[in-house]
Regions:
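Intrinsically disordered or highly flexible coil/loop and linker segments, enriched in small
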Residues: 30, 52, 144, 169, ...
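Catalytic or ion-translocation cores adjacent to nucleophile or general acid/base/metal-coordination motifs
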Residues: 254, 260-280, 464-643
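Structured, charged N-terminal subsegments at the starts of enzyme catalytic cores
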Residues: 122-128, 132-141, 217, 221-224, ...
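Structured alpha-helical segments in the cores of large, soluble enzyme domains
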Residues: 133-136, 140-147, 164-187, 339, ...
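Acidic, glycine-enriched catalytic cores built around paired aspartates
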Residues: 2-82, 100-120, 185, 234, ...
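Extended, highly charged
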Residues: 2-233, 255-312, 356-359
Length: 730
């Protein structure tokens, strides 16, 4: 039987339930709530009609009060307007909770883009073996970041979670109490979170959502796709930026990095302990229960007394496999699925739970490296190796960076950023020792604009008594010019024998990050996206020529202006000329709670990502490939839109408008993130230093989507005027 269209399902469940539960607000014991709920629709109607007539906001508000509430004092007017905001905020939370509750009804959990659909499609086209082969080599890497786009405090997110459960259970009394709780709960934070606070809030999603949803997917693949064959791939990697992302955040220290890594390990061990405790109630068989309880005890001791009781990952894996073997050999495989579920999760999450990435700006690295070379102890240690470094050309500087190594202590330096940069590398080694190599094995260089930017990090790793660093060095290309130069930079990197030797030790794979947010801020929507697409094609071709595998790590935000949108459709649309053995992307702030906040939404969206990568390889769609005419059209559109965007940015009042008319000055004053709204300490506003999030967010708050679409209309209109629009539509 055919399902109703999605919009009909949405109206039937979400909209109708919202109307029912929204009426509960009127029953809450708040003095002004009836007045607010009665006045709000009238006010909305005045706003709608006034906006249609082109009236400014002040005139609309004054007209409303003069006509409807003429006796109100200025204080009472302000109070009512503030009550409107409070009321609408809580209506939005209710709507979010109802959406979460109705997710499985509105979205087809077994439809297109899900693993079940993909498996059936592969089966019917005789591609099941091909699918298995591909799944053994394909990965999705979700990197959680604490970018400040989540305005809800943790207490409100908790209420949303409880509300969605209550609505699913049709518990009217509980829902009413939760709405009253919502009415008494602050929607703002008293103080800025620390980087560790941000890490803790995101670890909640790892513990309560991803641990189960990703585990379920791996379970499904083993049971239904691979069956008697073996899945030798964990499928998912989870990355983690809070506590490790130093780019523009002076509050991320080496101590915070280590503390965050310890918290990640503690959290995953706690999940293993809970799973073992649950297993002990089922696996009550002779010879099995003793093993489960012994393992449970060892995990408990490692959790709460790690210094005295160390636990090796290999031991945990071996014991679980022994328990599985006993179930099969002596107990007819009873509850085998439960022990396999835990085995898969241990393989997936190890002792690291999520891999911490370190990230820093290349300009900071450059300053740090200059400080290193001026240091007396370093000069004494390295001698002629670094002589005249600053006066040499880039080729010779890179030659030195490739050769130098040693044991430079952070204690050599009084400069804070230099000492902390080197100390962070020592912390990397410590995390790998405690949590396994995956605990922290990637170093991202933001604003990467040269070969030297990459080799400076390579040199610092080897100067930290780490001759063969177990670290993936990842250049992040963000601006339009850096994206255009990325291929020549990476080509020089691939022609460096010492670096290639390092790359071979890392599986002959180079990860390259591409920044959608800063790219769009720099060049506008069309130019940024087209430049990234072309960079991926060129870098894929280059990597193939050098027999190197390349993985693209996409720095994507929530809105289109920061690379957001329908992520799975984006990956579906990539042509066959782009290497895609991995999908790697950042998931930021509010996108985490909205797309991965519940078990159902998390599993659904993870499956969509997984199937989007598979689809391009197993069911090849040549319609995604662009021909010469398509490329010419895109080049022209991107160039025209870029010029319009650049001309707008060059307007003498552009920055003044941002500072004085939009919400930009308030971003730095909100308590939604630990990171400052701009890089550096300059008081004067500079687009180069301004973060993409406040830039995009400020335009968005003003209802002017400049970063998302400015210049696109100009380019499209040019084709329309010249009767060439069919070239755009083809």
């Amino acid at each position: 039987m055919a399902r109703e269209p999605k919009i009909d399902r949405f109206n039937e469940v979400i909209r109708s339930k919202f109307q029912i539960y929204n009426s509960l607000f009127l029953t809450l014991p708040f003095a002004s709530i009836k007045r607010t709920s009665l006045m709000l629709p009238l006010f909305a109607d005045y706003c709608k009609k006034g906006y249609a007539k082109g009236q400014n906001p002040m005139r609309i508000v004054n007209k409303f009060f003069n006509k409807i509430l003429p006796d109100y004092s200025e204080n009472k007017k302000n109070e009512l307007l503030f009550n409107f905001i409070q009321y609408v905020e809580r209506q939005v939370v209710l709507f979010d909770a109802i959406e979460d509750a109705g997710f499985s009804y509105v979205n087809n959990l077994h439809g297109r883009g899900t693993l079940r659909f993909m498996k059936e499609e592969a089966d019917s086209s005789d591609n099941l073996d091909k699918l298995r082969e591909y799944l053994n080599n394909f990965k999705v890497r979700i990197v959680l970041t604490a970018h400040p786009t989540q305005f809800y405090p943790g207490s409100v997110l908790g209420i949303i979670n409880d509300l969605s459960k209550s609505i699913n259970n049709d518990s009217l009394d509980t829902t009413k109490k939760l709405l009253e709780q919502l009415g008494r709960t602050r929607f703002y934070k008293n103080k800025k979170p620390t980087p560790y606070d941000e890490a803790t809030s995101l670890i909640w999603y790892l513990e309560n959502v991803f641990f189960h949803s990703a585990g379920s997917i791996v379970n499904y693949l083993n049971k239904n796709v691979f069956e008697t064959k073996k899945l030798d791939n964990s499928i998912f990697d989870f990355g983690f930026w809070p506590g490790g992302d130093r780019d523009g955040n002076p509050y991320v220290t080496p101590d915070i990095t280590l503390k965050t890594a310890n918290k990640l390990k503690h959290s995953v061990l706690r999940n293993y302990y809970r799973a073992l405790r649950s297993l002990s109630r089922k696996l009550t068989f002779e010879g099995v229960l003793e093993k489960v309880e012994n393992l449970q005890d060892k995990v408990y001791k490692a959790l709460f007394n790690a210094e005295k009781h160390t636990l090796k990952l290999s031991y945990l894996e071996d014991e679980l496999n022994q328990i599985h073997k006993l179930l099969k050999q002596k107990n007819d495989g009873l509850y085998e699925d439960l022990i396999l579920d835990l085995i898969y999760k241990v393989k997936l999450f190890g002792f690291h739970f999520a891999s911490m990435d370190l990230r820093q700006d290349s300009r900071v690295h450059s300053d740090v490296f200059n400080n290193i070379l001026k240091n007396k102890e370093v000069i004494s240690l390295l001698g002629n190796q670094i002589k005249n470094y600053s006066t040499l050309d880039e080729k010779n500087r890179c030659e030195i960076l490739t050769k130098i190594k040693g044991n430079i202590s952070p204690s050599f330096f009084t400069n804070k950023i230099t000492a902390e940069t080197l100390e962070s590398i020592q912390v990397m080694k410590e995390i790998q020792k405690n949590n396994g190599e995956k605990g922290c094995n990637r170093y991202i260089i933001s604003n990467c604009n040269s070969l030297e930017s990459i080799l400076q990090v390579f040199a610092m790793l080897r100067l930290s008594n780490w001759n063969k660093p177990k670290v993936d060095i990842i250049p992040l290309f963000e601006t339009i010019s850096d994206l255009k130069n990325s291929t020549s930079i990476v080509k020089s990197l691939f022609e460096n024998p010492t670096y290639i030797s390092h790359l071979e030790s890392r599986g002959n794979k180079q990860t390259i990050m591409l920044g959608f947010s800063d790219g769009t801020k720099d060049g506008g929507y069309l130019m940024a996206n087209w430049s990234i697409y072309k960079a991926k094609e060129d870098l894929s071709k280059l990597a193939s020529e050098y027999n190197i595998s390349v993985a693209f790590f996409d720095g994507r935000g929530g809105p289109p202006a920061r690379g957001g949108g329908r992520t799975h459709e984006f990956y579906n649309s990539l042509g066959n000329d782009i290497q895609a053995d991995d999908i790697q992307l950042t998931i930021q702030g509010q996108t985490i709670s909205s797309n991965f906040g519940t078990l159902e939404s998390s599993q659904y969206n993870l499956e969509q990502l997984l199937s989007s990568g598979i689809k391009n390889e197993i069911f090849i769609n040549n319609s995604n490939n662009l021909d010469t005419q398509d490329r010419d059209t895109m080049d022209n559109l991107a160039s025209m839109s870029h010029k319009a965007y650049e001309d707008f940015k060059a307007h003498p009042k552009f920055l003044k408008y941002l500072e004085n008319i939009t919400t930009l000055p308030y971003y730095a004053k909100t308590n939604i993130g630990s990171r400052p709204s701009k890089r550096g300490i300059n008081k004067e506003l500079s687009l180069d230093d301004l973060r993409a999030i406040p830039f995009v967010g400020s335009w968005s708050q003003s209802k002017q989507n400049v970063p998302g679409f400015y210049g696109v209309g100009t380019a499209l209109n040019e084709y329309k005027k010249n009767n060439k629009f069919r070239e755009v539509k083809r």
